[in-house]
Swiss-Prot record:
Protein's UniProt name: Phosphoribosylformylglycinamidine synthase
Lineage, broadest ranks: Bacteria, Pseudomonadati, Pseudomonadota, Gammaproteobacteria, Enterobacterales
Region (Disordered): 305-327
Gene3D superfamilies with a match to the protein in the record: 3.40.50.880, Phosphoribosylformylglycinamidine synthase, linker domain, PurM-like C-terminal domain, PurM-like, N-terminal domain
Reaction equations catalysed: N(2)-formyl-N(1)-(5-phospho-beta-D-ribosyl)glycinamide + L-glutamine + ATP + H2O = 2-formamido-N(1)-(5-O-phospho-beta-D-ribosyl)acetamidine + L-glutamate + ADP + phosphate + H(+)
Cellular component terms (Gene Ontology): cytoplasm
UniProt-listed PANTHER family: PHOSPHORIBOSYLFORMYLGLYCINAMIDINE SYNTHASE
Species assigned in the record: Escherichia coli O6:H1 (strain CFT073 / ATCC 700928 / UPEC)
Protein family according to the UniProt entry: In the N-terminal section; belongs to the FGAMS family.
Enzyme Commission number(s) of this protein: 6.3.5.3
UniProt domain Glutamine amidotransferase type-1: residue ranges: 1042-1295
Source organism superkingdom: Bacteria
Amino acid sequence: MMEILRGSPALSAFRINKLLARFQAARLPVHNIYAEYVHFADLNAPLNDDEHAQLERLLKYGPALASHAPQGKLLLVTPRPGTISPWSSKATDIAHNCGLQQVNRLERGVAYYIEAGTLTNEQWQQVTAELHDRMMETVFFALDDAEQLFAHHQPTPVTSVDLLGQGRQALIDANLRLGLALAEDEIDYLQDAFTKLGRNPNDIELYMFAQANSEHCRHKIFNADWIIDGEQQPKSLFKMIKNTFETTPDHVLSAYKDNAAVMEGSEVGRYFADHETGRYDFHQEPAHILMKVETHNHPTAISPWPGAATGSGGEIRDEGATGRGAKPKAGLVGFSVSNLRIPGFEQPWEEDFGKPERIVTALDIMTEGPLGGAAFNNEFGRPALNGYFRTYEEKVNSHNGEELRGYHKPIMLAGGIGNIRADHVQKGEINVGAKLVVLGGPAMNIGLGGGAASSMASGQSDADLDFASVQRDNPEMERRCQEVIDRCWQLGDANPILFIHDVGAGGLSNAMPELVSDGGRGGKFELRDILSDEPGMSPLEIWCNESQERYVLAVAADQLPLFDELCKRERAPYAVIGEATEELHLSLHDRHFDNQPIDLPLDVLLGKTPKMTRDVQTLKAKGDALAREGITIADAVKRVLHLPTVAEKTFLVTIGDRSVTGMVARDQMVGPWQVPVANCAVTTASLDSYYGEAMAIGERAPVALLDFAASARLAVGEALTNIAATQIGDIKRIKLSANWMAAAGHPGEDAGLYEAVKAVGEELCPALGLTIPVGKDSMSMKTRWQEGNEEREMTSPLSLVISAFARVEDVRHTITPQLSTEDNALLLIDLGKGNNALGATALAQVYRQLGDKPADVRDVAQLKGFYDAIQALVAQRKLLAYHDRSDGGLLVTLAEMAFAGHCGIDADIATLGDDRLAALFSEELGAVIQVRAADREAVEAVLAQHGLADCVHYVGQAVSGDRFVITANGQTVFSESRTTLRVWWAETTWQMQRLRDNPECADQEHQAKSNDADPGLNVKLSFDINEDVAAPFIATGARPKVAVLREQGVNSHVEMAAAFHRAGFDAIDVHMSDLLAGRTGLEGFHVLVACGGFSYGDVLGAGEGWAKSILFNDRVRDEFATFFHRPQTLALGVCNGCQMMSNLRELIPGSELWPRFVRNTSDRFEARFSLVEVTQSPSLLLQGMVGSQMPIAVSHGEGRVEVRDAAHLAALESKGLVALRYVDNFGKVTETYPANPNGSPNGITAVTTESGRVTIMMPHPERVFRTVSNSWHPENWGEDGPWMRIFRNARKQLG
């Protein structure tokens, strides 16, 4: 039976206005829209009155709901029948954890009530198209129609393909019907294999073969033999990449054989809880570094949010599934798309060349895709610290003559670093009889054929197959699985995981054969033991679907009880679906039909399938010299600053959490004005050291339209000039990931790919001492479509993205582009040796040209000398600022440095040659460094020692004020206000934020950037930052216990425990499942802290599901009530813990006036480094800090204080219960965005009880208790930041 329950409004006023404006633009007479959430409960038994009231209360969340009788025609948008949304999975979990076992499943839709004039059927179709994503949702016209969401179907049996009867044609038909993308020789191979076996193949076997042997999984092109211009080549592409490892194996612990590569890290204190006692402590050991970079291009072109989200999720799983289990740590992301053409902000170079119907626009990708990737990282709890964004779409005269080149098939890059224990780097042995386990969520009928689909050029496969290959994301489930993996590796030698892989393309059909084969075993499996939420799925759908957030593991049979215990505690679903066999054979039994859908020797599936040979021709690039008529420097500057590749990226940065883990030493945002221009990302290796890890990206794809090899060399060079900004030491410490994107088969591209791989793998990297131990390729970067009567295709440039990773000696020695205006000198190190080529630059692009001669690595020895010289200067503390020269050239380098320093520039380019345009806009490799004027001679001497004397040019100095002036020989070349340039640079971000978020907030942020008087972040402390008020109490040796409370989806508990640990507490890991099961109580604890994250993925309101699982469970409710009423206790709730505790008002004495916390005014997750003021309040944790103003990490989507009315707000303030407020950089309490990131009235962001014993706050003090984890800080701070005082106050209070 199905119950229908109304929910809160689904759209804010500005979202409704945006929709109405879209309808008006489409000439649809829609006058009014009202939208609200509707919940559907599928029940297995009726609810009594109390249970019904409980369910209603559970589904009451979000902003307060005014009573409303909807008017107009109903359009009900729900998930597609036959799919289960992540919302449903998490909401159903909450219902069960609150004791509502009669609920089979909860699902949610949005009911749109449309008031409109007379609309034709076609116009109604336009309206429904605007309201839903056809890839993931459907539209019903009555609430009762939602019954279809819960329809159960009978299982369907396996189907066989009549090869023996119909011969080869049967395979050809199956290839088309199932979208297998099999090549002719593979069809021959299968015909031969099954004829020898004397039986017909089943559909599931063919599907499994196609996935396991797709280009996506097998990398056939990279392993192929090559004939170029009739000449046999000595090496495959992959062999040339491996050459870098053979030449420089130093510091690499694992390459080419696992889900990620591993290099040596530092010996540090890894901080985690003991399995037996739950007590957190430091464990001194090597934290080796793993690295991986993936792409998820095809799904992102079809449906950007889930495409990018599952791209990030899959890469995170690769890291976790390295060795015998590892810990993902920090992420990077990248996008290459065609021109944005932002409505009302179209740029002169952006022509509309059309696109295929089935893929979305570049604007849609950049609106939704980054949100999907960020949302996954945020909810999983991994900071996203690095990225790139390029737009390119033009008709150019390249290798194949004049043709369309651009990114209709986008690049969506997802990568990152993690840490792994030394004894877990290598996979273990799989013994015969080992249990084969799937860890993670249930099988769902989604993402079928992603491996094969992404191996085709967009436009080749059937639209329905595209539809089937889109995946869904549930990061909170992946977090639970990762917690299990963490518990396993933390056991050291007792780790129950022998072998682990993630489930990605091809689902279990790819992952399980790979697992057993890599372990030297076969496997026998039971289909019906696989967890599944959809009983009507066929064997093929159960075995081959790409449901995300799953891992496959081999666990020794005697370790299964331990593994089961860990999974139950973390609430991570798992199933034992088979066991390892001696015989190298794969069998899958189906209990329901009592048959064998799969019965194959492993070598048929993974054996010597036909090897590819590429017989290709070289084409010479045409190109045309840059036509300069009509190009003025002033016009060029504005255009280049508007090019998205160059322009400010704030709209891509602030949506992503950059402080979670408490180990982020350098995020994208630089300095007191928080400008996104960092050279590289840096994390600390642990919560107790200054060792660390760095990541940086290099990418120059348009250059490949003129010179394939130069483009690849520049990508390596740029990654190097970016990562050089931190203290690494020997260049051999740097390891690269190479991600290759190409349109294989397009004239000239294959030979170009070979040339580019050779340039990097055989020549440049070995000469520099660099290794590429990991990478990925995507070989179908082309789209085809019909535009009117014309057949069109858009081919991407050959694109190499290099991600550089390194161990860092001291994270405090990371240099940013932030300029200082004291006596200084700016030096350009020009590795282009004065060539100043303008081919394939930003300048050429904004004037719709390609040019003819591009930049290149002019001298490998000088590039190496450059890196060594910068490292020497970093170690000697001689650099005040550093920024590499890249897209936009020297002009953009200087401008970004001036933005970060909020200062003027007085530059002189007289020594850079007579061609001023080329001097300013050439993108040759190099960097601008700022040094003290007194150090200039010594610095130039270091540069000369490294062979760079002829590359160094004095180009002026940074000055206070707002003028940005470039001269040569006394003549002004360019002069403008820095503020004007800053505004131009910000306009792309502003327009994207206006489109995507609340336009009022976007306008306020843009306006703030034009305020030259803004003093930036600043600090005013009312206490001595170096005083440790807890020291006398720590000296007694007594360590009171703090319960570090987490629920499924919480992700900030480790850094919270570390902050309390430093203040003299014993921090104990307490999971809600421990309390609910009665394994742990709160009676032994002095302090309770509820941590940040996304409990239940924030469904049913942020923190509300967590709170209700306490309130609706009598024993646990009593446990909390008793704790809060005990006089000697303290409690702290941060972020998600704050939201949760604000819903426990009925249990917490003196909290009656507390507000609720709801959706931010911007309607967006906000990650900011915000200034707050400590106000006079009873809070015991903030004693002695009143009047202080200091920055703090903020990361939330629902942090806006909601009060009942003005009287409620007045009472809250008059009682003095407000503990922290947001202030602007002038120290004034503010409601203006983004200084107030959520729009809370009067800047309120923390409240306390009348006794001051319980304090809840939205910002994160635990993420910035160490100075080094602050995005910016005054130089005189020591090891501890000012927020450490909160934790020491707690220790002082307990005496």
